Amino acid sequence: MTTFKEAMTFKDVAVVFTEEELGLLDLAQRKLYRDVMLENFRNLLSVGHQAFHRDTFHFLREEKIWMMKTAIQREGNSGDKIQTEMETVSEAGTHQEWSFQQIWEKIASDLTRSQDLVINSSQFSKEGDFPCQTEAGLSVIHTRQKSSQGNGYKPSFSDVSHFDFHQQLHSGEKSHTCDECGKNFCYISALRIHQRVHMGEKCYKCDVCGKEFSQSSHLQTHQRVHTGEKPFKCVECGKGFSRRSALNVHHKLHTGEKPYNCEECGKAFIHDSQLQEHQRIHTGEKPFKCDICGKSFCGRSRLNRHSMVHTAEKPFRCDTCDKSFRQRSALNSHRMIHTGEKPYKCEECGKGFICRRDLYTHHMVHTGEKPYNCKECGKSFRWASCLLKHQRVHSGEKPFQCEECGKGFYTNSQCYSHQRSHSGEKPYKCVECGKGYKRRLDLDFHQRVHTGEKLYNCKECGKSFSRAPCLLKHERLHSG
């Protein structure tokens, strides 16, 4: 039986994802995956208890180049021959999407071509001119035993610490802990990237708006806001997304999957962050505070929308009527008013809606569901935003004021509708008769005159009404 020592290659310690598993990672996670594998390769060169010869191994990090000089043992017809090669691997620019093929080929293949590399540890230890910098004093030298037939392989380790290190790679043990927040990581490189959050280090700056980021992958994702690039396409409906994670969340709209449930009211959500924001409605927690007026919000997106009230910023403009909006989604919904498009249909009554949220609210008319309850008066609401608006009745808060007359309102939409009384604007036109209205809700009520639709039924006598206030007025006749 022949025994010899061989260096553990990168493929021995790499964390390998399948194509399907990698498809679930967003760009930042792929960047982290690449960094972790590079860290693993550096560990192979740096953590051994034997020193490596300067002329045989050299691994350095320059501006954007990884360079490696390897000694490769090649076997040919003429016998063993030592050949030295210089391998240069250029890092991808900030605008490159790292696919599975690129990650594995550039790192696993290019950096580990030394599959047949043999390290003569006794020779290198005598040189001693390239001191090894270790973090854990670990050696990554395998002892490989081959039978005379060449068909037996048994990896072993020179001491217990070597085995512990090797096992950690397979077990996913998170031994690197952040001193700031206590979060754990499998690899020191992942910890270093995470620590930039606490240090406030932002090395990557957007040339367009000047915004800074701690990771180049975050900058790349941000730049798509300016370019409009949406490389991730939904195979079901063709909708594009700038981030893979957003596409993964969108897929759940087609599958109907809502794995995150609220324990208070039972409402289900597609994403964990949606559940966390929703739960703050029950707890009353509002951690996001406006620096200008001090108003607090349960979600960062709500704070961002509110901030535009102070700046009056409305960057999204309708090409048809020149109306401006603070959000692109609001502009897209508005355009359907001009086109008459109502893509979301109710399966119960066939009524169409411009946005999915309106359809969801409409479904509650049929089910009678009102999951949001006011703790002050017990009144129930179908939508969380309606509850928040209602709570201002109890608090007396009227944060939205008319610039013309100074009148205060509970909601921005009420203030906006009121301002049309000064301007005389009636942007919502009936396609049947051309009559204009200040509010879309009034237009919806009016259109029922043409359609004959009466959604609100009296439980006592079965009489139907086109508007909820008419039903309430009628029910008082029965109650006396």
Curated annotation (Swiss-Prot):
Record has Iron-sulfur as a keyword: no
GO molecular function: DNA-binding transcription factor activity, RNA polymerase II-specific; RNA polymerase II cis-regulatory region sequence-specific DNA binding; zinc ion binding
Localization (cell): Nucleus
Domain of life: Eukaryota
Zn finger region (C2H2-type): 176-198, 204-226, 232-254, 260-282, 288-310, 316-338, 344-366, 372-394, 400-422, 428-450, 456-478
Domain KRAB as annotated: residue spans: 8-78
Keywords, comma-separated and alphabetical: DNA-binding, Metal-binding, Nucleus, Repeat, Transcription, Transcription regulation, Zinc, Zinc-finger
One record GO biological process: positive regulation of transcription by RNA polymerase II
Major place of residence: nucleus
GO annotation, cellular component aspect: nucleus
Family listed: Belongs to the krueppel C2H2-type zinc-finger protein family.
Listed PANTHER family: C2H2-TYPE DOMAIN-CONTAINING PROTEIN-RELATED, ZINC FINGER PROTEIN ZIC AND GLI
Role of this protein: May be involved in transcriptional regulation.
Protein known as: Zinc finger protein
Annotated source species: Chlorocebus aethiops
